[in-house]
From Swiss-Prot:
InterPro entries: AcrB_DN_DC_subdom (IPR027463), Acrflvin-R (IPR001036), MdtF-like (IPR004764). This is Multidrug/solvent efflux pump membrane transporter MepB. PANTHER family: MULTIDRUG EFFLUX PUMP SUBUNIT ACRB-RELATED, PTHR32063. Keywords: Antibiotic resistance, Cell inner membrane, Cell membrane, Membrane, Transmembrane, Transmembrane helix, Transport. The inner membrane transporter component of an organic solvent and antibiotic efflux pump; confers resistance to toluene, hexane, p-xylene, ampicillin, penicillin G, erythromycin, novobiocin and tetracycline. Its main location: membrane. GO terms for cellular component: plasma membrane. It is a multi-pass membrane protein. SUPFAM superfamilies: Multidrug efflux transporter AcrB pore domain, PN1, PN2, PC1 and PC2 subdomains, Multidrug efflux transporter AcrB TolC docking domain, DN and DC subdomains, Multidrug efflux transporter AcrB transmembrane domain. GO terms for molecular function: efflux transmembrane transporter activity; xenobiotic transmembrane transporter activity.
């Protein structure tokens, strides 16, 4: 094949150009993400039950739906949370690889079975089923710069004018408004109702009857009488539109003809649908809408589309209102991708310099360098065909591939120059002769390296997604590299290399290259003597190898484990929790203190603070608060102002708050897998011990966790039990008084809850009508005495006649996990510890809890647990595949052993480098480790294959090994140094994505240094020892050519 293209160099150029063109076009179409879709697909069900407690929502809604969800294909786990404001969310998480559209259809079908069993009030509110991830993509805020609009005005504007276009934007999965639109609020006065012998039920019935839209038909509609000349639509009664119209609703006509209207017993006006949440941006009145990404959607494309949507809406904003993005996860995507691209360019430059240093021929260096853009651009084309994206994982793989892909070109160019020098052939003929010698070896080495990485492509789960990105990218680059080395590089050699006279290649050079060559040759001579000494004294070095293996095993056990390294995402969360039962006003005081500290004391780091009162990730309620903190760009912050340093300083300050618990935490590396770094676990009531016992177990767990030196910031992702007023109805007494239970329940729901009646029209938009008691009539238990129910005789009976109450405790938020009541706990490893060690400590503490209490990992912790169980199998498969490929390559079961034995020599260096830098054994480390294994095997192949052929030609094992080492030292050092320097930019990276770059670069550099330095001494030992052990015959007479050369070009 190579001969064909050597004779037709333009044909080779055309193929190379086509490959680059296809790759360039693919880059324009490839989506850009920080990570691929690592998180498993999730479907969320959202429901609201106005006026219901968390327990009521759980008993009447959550469990009904959960029981119907059983039997859905590929369902991994189901979690739910019920809140005291009547809201509820059930999240069904599926196995990685499940089609989210299919999952949503299956969930919807199961939900249809449950809907008729739900309370009527829930069905009236509607049930939302969305494809969504757990975290927010970004928050869009509206802030009143001049204070002319209140938070309620802004929230109404968002819901009325922005919510719909935002929800229609491609890629938006779900959203949450921090506030509510206007509703027609009817505030009942119980004294006036009693005065007119009316009840809340009467008012609701009258409003429902008189605020209606009637379809009145037509005059002259078909079929019509002959001769009909008129056709007109009849406009009947329509929905009310103003507070004045509602005040005129007729409630009662007295015997004397006087009328009682709604305005006589209630205050009517526009107000919020609910008042649970309020927001501020840098202390100014604001409202916001948090957007969640749809499963499988592109983050950058979605964020760009949302910004364009907002830009189109801005001309219609009220005066003094400005749109802001107080929380945005996409800048880190562009910054991290940009950083890796710079790393890629730096790697190419460093590899070029190393090649030029060793080849000492500018034309030869240019030839090898020209293969880089061809292979890299071609790889992008393969990524597009495979449905991948441009992300940090594929870009890291590109960086790792640079050192591999130039290696094939180096082998071709070096061998062509050797043939020209030894045989005096012109470039074209020398290239043909050279390619005949090395074609098989090029393919063989590519197969071995692919064997190391291909098993990664077949693993499942979120970890499997990460492995596949690396595996497919590197293997594709290597495949293209071999193709280019067989087609394009020979054509370049035949046309670009200058002819060499016989022996000219080895003539001494002057200047720097002469100095370098002389010193390198002296090193080669010393190396040759050292190898001879090792082969003459095998036992001490075999024992040293055994010690290296033991050290490798010890380091593996010692290095802490993790899933992914932490990253500075440029955003920080702060969560506020005031004592149970605290008012919103009390919580706002703490929120203000927190914001003041961040904007003043951390002004060099913090760009903006968006605070929310009434909501946090732990739950909703007046005792909850949240801050979304945007940091300044990475290039404006030093290491002392990283997100982790800020979180630590902020947490120390927040510990001084006496009236609240405030936690500052950074988001995880993969935002799709949760909202916080560290671990995520559910304590479960598997024994049915009840809420109180589960709460006791939770508190016991938190107490023990606080004493552990391994754990930090351990907190419940829920709310503490708070005071609740248990109202008991005496059914017998009520019956004796002639009061029905239905009237009692309806009166309570309307007066103390917020009862939805129907809808009205406000400025062309349909909004809701709510009836509720005025605030002064529902502030304390004594206010219940103000409310009356009419009995069968028409008499007004006070609640005090048949109801009594007592104070108790209950949870404002209830969680369930896989069908049982549960409590979520979040936390992080203490400084100096990894998430793997923290998870082991959590399991130890959970094992000491009372019987009936179990635990389950979720989110990123679930994925980390899964990845840890996969690592040994992946490692073993990779080594096995290498062995099998080598056995096929050499037609021998013994020779591959000499190559495989080099694996620990690379691993030990990766472990030492990772340990010295304080990094963890995570997914990136494992990818780097497997790459190191492949490269270490490649270096061993260069020596073993050459030694094997020399031995078959009649050399002794000893002489064959030494000669192979001497001849292959220079290319081994050159390719290894090129690879190491190509990865150096990863290890010294800073800014966005630096954690991942350090994790993968450190292990690879350490592994390659040890694999190169140690392998060149131990590989000949392995070759001789294994060959002797398996009975390789020594020649009868040693043949020592004067100028031994490796005719295979290896």
């Amino acid at each position: 094949m190579s001969k064909f293209f050597i004779d037709r160099p333009i044909f080779a150029w055309v193929i190379a150009l086509v490959i680059m063109l296809v790759g360039a076009l693919s880059i324009l179409k490839l989506p850009i993400n920080q990570y691929p879709s690592i998180a498993p697909p999730a479907i969320a069900i959202a429901v609201t039950y106005p006026g219901a407690s968390a327990q009521t929502v759980q008993d009447t809604v959550v469990q009904v739906i959960e029981q119907q969800l059983n039997g859905i294909d590929n369902l991994r786990y189901v979690s739910s949370e019920s809140n005291s404001d009547g809201s509820m969310t059930i999240t069904a998480t599926f196995e990685q690889g499940t089609n989210p559209d299919t999952a949503q259809v299956q969930v919807q079908n199961k939900l249809n079975l449950a809907t008729p069993l739900l309370p009527q009030e829930v069905q009236q509110q509607g049930i939302r089923v969305t494809k969504a991830v757990k975290n927010f993509l970004l928050v869009i805020g509206l802030v009143s710069e001049d204070g002319s609009m209140t938070k309620d005005d802004l929230a109404n504007y968002i819901v009325s004018n922005m919510q719909d276009p935002i929800s229609r934007t491609a890629g938006v999965g779900d959203f949450q408004v921090f506030g509510a639109q206007y509703a027609m609020r009817i505030w009942l006065d119980p004294a006036k109702l009693n005065k007119f012998q009316l009840t809340p039920v009467d008012v609701k019935t009258a409003v429902a009857a008189q605020n209606v839209q009637v379809s009145s038909g037509q005059l002259g509609g078909l079929p019509a009488l002959p001769g009909t000349q008129l056709n007109a639509t009849i406009i009947g009664k329509t929905r009310l539109q103003t507070a004045e119209q509602f005040e005129s609703i007729l409630l009662k006509v007295n015997k004397d003809g006087s009328q009682v209207r709604l305005g006589d017993v209630a205050q009517v006006g526009l107000g919020g649908e609910n008042y649970a949440v309020s927001a501020q941006f840098n202390g100014k009145p604001a409202s916001g809408l948090a957007v969640k990404l749809a499963t499988g959607a592109n983050a950058l494309d979605t964020a760009k589309a949302l910004r364009e949507t907002i830009k189109g809406l801005e001309p219609f904003f009220p005066p003094g209102v400005k749109a802001v993005f107080p929380y945005d996860t996409t800048p880190v995507v562009t910054e991290s991708i940009s950083g890796v691209i710079h790393t890629l360019i730096e790697a190419v430059v460093l590899v070029f310099l190393v090649m030029y240093l060793f080849l000492q021929n500018f034309r030869a260096t240019i030839i090898t360098t020209m293969t880089v853009p061809v292979v890299l651009l071609g790889t992008f084309g393969i990524l597009a065909a495979a449905g991948f994206s441009i992300n940090t994982l594929t870009m890291f793989a590109m960086v790792l591939a640079i050192g591999l892909l130039v290696d094939d070109a180096i082998v071709v160019v070096e061998n062509v120059e050797r043939v020209m020098s030894e045989e005096g052939l012109p470039p074209k003929e020398a290239t043909k002769r050279s390619m005949e010698q090395i074609q098989g070896a090029l393919v063989g080495i590519a197969l071995v390296l692919s064997a190391v990485l291909l098993p990664m492509a077949f693993f499942g789960g979120s970890t499997g997604v990460i492995y596949r990105q690396f595996s497919i990218t590197i293997v594709s680059a290597m495949g293209l590299s071999v193709l280019v080395a067989l087609i394009f590089t020979p054509a370049l050699c035949a046309t670009m290399l200058k002819p060499l006279k016989k022996g000219e290649h080895h003539t001494a050079k002057g200047g720097f290259f002469g100095w370098f060559n002389r010193n390198f040759d002296r090193s080669v001579n010393g190396y040759e003597r050292s190898v001879g000494a090792i082969l003459r004294n095998k036992v001490p070095f075999l024992l040293a190898y055994a010690l290296i293996v033991v050290g490798m095993i010890w380091l593996f056990a010692r290095i802490p484990t993790a899933f992914l390294p932490e990253e500075d995402q440029g955003v920080l969360f702060a969560q506020v929790q005031t004592p149970a039962g605290s008012s919103a006003e009390r919580t706002q005081v703490v929120v203000d203190q927190m914001r003041e500290y961040l904007l003043k004391d951390e002004a060099d780091t913090v760009s903006s603070v968006f605070t929310v009162n009434g909501f946090n990730f732990a739950g909703r309620g007046q005792s909850s608060g949240m801050a979304f903190i945007m940091l300044k760009p990475w290039d404006e912050r030093s290491k002392e102002n990283s997100v982790f340093a800020l979180a630590q300083r902020a947490q120390q300050h927040f510990f001084t708050f006496r009236d609240a618990m405030v936690f500052a935490f950074a988001p995880p590396a993969v935002l799709e897998l949760g909202n916080a770094t560290g671990f995520d676990v559910f304590l479960q009531d598997r024994g049915g011990v009840g809420h109180e016992k589960l709460m006791e177990a939770r508190n016991q767990f938190l107490a023990k966790a606080a004493q552990s030196k391994i754990l930090s910031a351990v907190r419940p992702n829920g709310l503490n039990d708070e005071p609740q007023y248990q109202l008991t109805i005496d059914d017998e007494r009520a019956s004796a008084l002639g009061v029905t239970i239905a009237d009692i329940n309806n009166t309570l729901s309307i007066a103390l809850g917020a009862s939805y009646v129907n809808d009205f029209i406000d400025r062309g938009r349909v909004k809701k009508v709510y009836i509720q008691g005025e605030p002064s009539a529902r502030m304390s238990p004594e206010d219940l005495q103000k409310w009356y129910v009419r009995n069968g005789a028409g008499e007004m009976v006070p609640f005090s006649s048949f109801a009594k109450g007592e104070w108790t405790y209950g949870s404002p938020k209830l969680s369930r996990y896989n069908g049982v009541e549960a409590m979520e706990i979040l936390g992080a490893p203490a400084p100096g510890y990894s998430t793997g060690e923290a998870m082991a400590e959590v399991e130890r503490i959970a094992g000491e809890l009372p019987s009936g209490i179990g635990f389950s990992w979720t989110g990123m912790s679930y994925e980390e647990k899964l990845s840890g169980s996969q690592m040994p199998a992946l490692f073993a498969l990779s080594v096995l595949f290498v062995f099998l490929c080598l056995a096929a390559l050499y037609e021998s079961w013994s020779i591959p052993i000499a190559v495989v034995l080099v694996v620990p020599l690379g691993i030990i260096g990766a472990l030492i480098a990772t340990s010295l830098r304080g990094l963890s054994n995570d997914v990136y480390f494992l990818v780097g480790l497997l790459t190191t294994i492949g490269l270490a095997a490649k270096n061993a192949i260069l020596i073993v294959e050459f030694a094997k052929e020399l031995h078959e030609q009649g050399r002794s094992l000893y002489d064959a090994a030494i000669e192979a080492c001497r001849m292959r030292l220079r290319p081994i050092i050159m390719t290894s140094l090129a690879f190491i320097l190509g990865v150096v930019p990863l290890t010294i990276a800073s800014g966005a994505g630096a954690g991942s770059q350090h994790a993968i670069g450190t292990g690879v550099i350490g592994g390659m240094i040890s694999a190169t330095v140690l392998a060149i001494f131990w590989v000949p030992l392995f070759f001789v020892a294994v060959s002797s052990l398996f009975g390789s015959k020594e020649p009868e007479k040693d043949v020592t050519p004067e100028n031994p050369r490796y005719e295979a070009g290896q």
